[in-house]
Amino acid sequence: MFNSNVKLGIAPIAWTNDDMPDLGKENTFEQCISEMALAGFKGSEVGNKYPRDVEVLKKALELRDMEIASAWFSAFLTTKPYEETEKAFIEHRDFLNAMGAKVIVVSEQGHSIQGQMETPIFDGKYVLNEEEWKTLAEGLNKLGALAKEKGMKLVYHHHMGTVVQTTEEIDKLMDLTDENLVYLLFDSGHLVYSGEDALEVLKKYVNRVKHVHLKDIRKKKVEEVKRDKLSFLQGVRKGAFTVPGDGDIDFEPIFKVLDDNNYEGYLLVEAEQDPAIANPLEYAIKARKYIKEKTNL
């Protein structure tokens, strides 16, 4: 299964959490990438403890035969002047380009509640009006063109608590944006958490999917988040997310759709948990074994 153009990566968020820095504060950058390599992963996204000096970061990764797959970028196209987002995006793009990454992960954070500790994730989500949708799509097309200038692709990350979370919102975004400028990051965990049919979304947009986050969920924990009106971050602390093979999502059909459509790019394990409870190396190894078992990668 899968051709040689599919790579495996893992996100540092299991070791150190960017949104809640107390989670994993004791874990160093070197420990993080060493354990990723030890578990058998090639790529990483960029965490808050990673050096931003290209040469320093490259050397640390090359010592472990690793590379940067991408890094998250927060856009504020619906709440701030476009120029502010563009300036930050160009800087982000150039850093990733220097690191050899091919895709740029973008998520609209205007009106987002994902980082609010007390806002119920299932109740407080903002819904864009038509004018805001137009602003978002036009801005993303411009950013996508800037990515293309460097031979890179903008991959949009649908995410819990943001203005693009549901199937309907993903449909709207895909419809309003240029398919040659704006691509999709498929995140299994965020779709299932939201109550969507992740497989159907993947089937519909597989040819625009250029980056994949393999995230599993514990359905009982998600039900508790909904019942107790917890925030996204409170859900993370509760253990709503985990690595593939440890939760309730069946990844075999997901792998099959990707393989049948000749997916190329990264399959990146991303599962934020409390590292004091879920040992990052142990869970990285668990994920790696599961992926090997199901895909032979």
Curated annotation (Swiss-Prot):
Q: Which GO terms describe its molecular function?
A: manganese ion binding; myo-inosose-2 dehydratase activity
Instruction: Tell me what reaction this enzyme catalyses.
Output: scyllo-inosose = 3D-3,5/4-trihydroxycyclohexane-1,2-dione + H2O
> Could you say which EC number(s) this protein's record lists?
4.2.1.44
**Could you tell me which pathway this protein works in?**
Polyol metabolism; myo-inositol degradation into acetyl-CoA; acetyl-CoA from myo-inositol: step 2/7
Q: Which GO biological process entries does UniProt record here?
A: inositol catabolic process
Source organism's superkingdom?
Bacteria
Q: Which Pfam families match?
A: AP_endonuc_2
| Gene3D superfamilies linked to this entry | Divalent-metal-dependent TIM barrel enzymes
The record's keywords, sorted A to Z, are:
Cobalt, Lyase, Manganese
Q: Which cofactor does it need?
A: glutathione; Co(2+); Mn(2+)
Does the record bear Manganese in its keywords? yes
The family classification in the record reads: Belongs to the IolE/MocC family.
List, alphabetically, the HAMAP family matched: IolE (MF_01672)
The protein's matches in NCBIfam families, at most eight in alphabetical order, are given as: myo_inos_iolE
The name this protein goes by in its record: Inosose dehydratase
> From which source organism is this entry?
Clostridium perfringens (strain 13 / Type A)
Q: What is the lineage of its organism?
A: Bacteria, Bacillati, Bacillota, Clostridia, Eubacteriales
